[in-house]
């Protein structure tokens, strides 16, 4: 099967980006072309395999992915971030599983959630942000009514169906990706740091009827070029996260729900998640963080009342 590899980047990943390029040209099933969508205003990196082609686009995690991909001539696209290492047979393996399961979208499980420390996993579950599921023979990742997600704690098969996943790497048809109109979700680029674009993209695929498959034990490594965790960035990420959760919950959880009873459950779930998050900040004496979270929720609610939001097509 033929495919095109497309990469979104700022051109600043350095050696991590070089490892991605090297692993792409070393694939047992190599791409027909490597297209790199780089943000306007950034320099083309020196790292190269001398076959990649650059296209300048508007900056943004969504803006650099929600494209028409007119340059792509193949049926399939392998979507990538710029800081991954790919085993030589991974693309061939992903295509094989796509055919085996009859899936529309295939994505590797990159983040080992079960390997987090117990205390972190406990707090994530208590907050409604992320929780483990046990003895689930069907699902990998699922979206929760708190706007968080749950994951399969003990996967034993090579792949499971999912409602969301990490967006650093996935394979699908170009037509299937275009069908979800990801450009409608550019509201996520409003913040300095985009949060949740992966969850929105995958869940929109799921709600559109596309069958998503999570592949386990792939050997893909997330080299994580974005390692800066300054106090300023931490505050910005917290703010963006709570703006995102407010909007995602309303757009993708609450509005599509037809049952009045379940809508009440939705309200209770997000209310619990926000109350827990705010209370934790108070208990820790982090009044600055409390204010950041509260202000972010207010901004999210303000956007829900905006004309721009009301004009977005509804998620069914």
Predicted regions located by residue number:
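N-proximal low-complexity "stem/linker" segments adjacent to membrane-targeting elements
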Residues: 1-26
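Acidic donor-binding loop at a coil-to-helix junction in glycosyltransferase catalytic cores
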Residues: 165-169, 188-203
């Amino acid at each position: 099967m033929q495919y095109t590899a497309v990469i979104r980047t700022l051109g600043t990943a350095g050696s991590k980006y070089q490892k991605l390029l090297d692993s792409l040209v070393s694939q047992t099933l190599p791409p027909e072309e490597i297209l790199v969508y780089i943000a306007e205003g950034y320099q083309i990196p020196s790292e190269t395999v001398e076959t990649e082609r650059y296209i300048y686009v508007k900056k943004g995690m969504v803006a650099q992915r929600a494209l028409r991909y007119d340059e792509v001539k193949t049926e399939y696209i392998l979507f990538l971030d710029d800081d991954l290492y790919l085993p030589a047979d991974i693309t061939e393996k992903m295509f094989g599983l796509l055919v085996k399961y009859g899936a529309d979208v295939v994505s590797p499980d990159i983040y080992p959630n079960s390997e987090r420390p117990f205390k972190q996993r406990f707090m994530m579950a208590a907050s409604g942000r992320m929780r483990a599921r046990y003895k689930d023979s069907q699902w990998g990742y699922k979206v929760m009514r708190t706007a968080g997600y749950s994951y399969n704690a003990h996967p034993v098969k090579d792949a499971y169906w999912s409602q969301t996943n990490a967006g650093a790497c996935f394979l699908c048809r170009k037509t299937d990706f275009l069908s979800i109109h990801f450009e409608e979700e550019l509201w996520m680029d409003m913040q300095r740091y985009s949060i949740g674009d992966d969850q929105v993209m995958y869940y929109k695929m799921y709600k559109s009827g596309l069958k998503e498959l999570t592949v386990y034990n792939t050997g893909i490594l997330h080299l994580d070029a974005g390692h800066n965790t300054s106090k300023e960035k931490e505050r910005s990420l917290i703010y963006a996260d709570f703006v995102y959760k407010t909007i995602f919950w309303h757009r993708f959880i609450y509005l599509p729900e037809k049952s009045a009873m379940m809508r009440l459950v939705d309200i209770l779930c997000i209310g619990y998640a926000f109350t827990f998050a705010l209370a934790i900040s108070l208990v820790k004496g982090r009044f600055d963080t409390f204010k950041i979270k509260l202000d972010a929720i207010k901004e999210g609610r303000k956007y829900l009342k905006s004309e721009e939001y009301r004009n977005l097509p509804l998620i069914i």
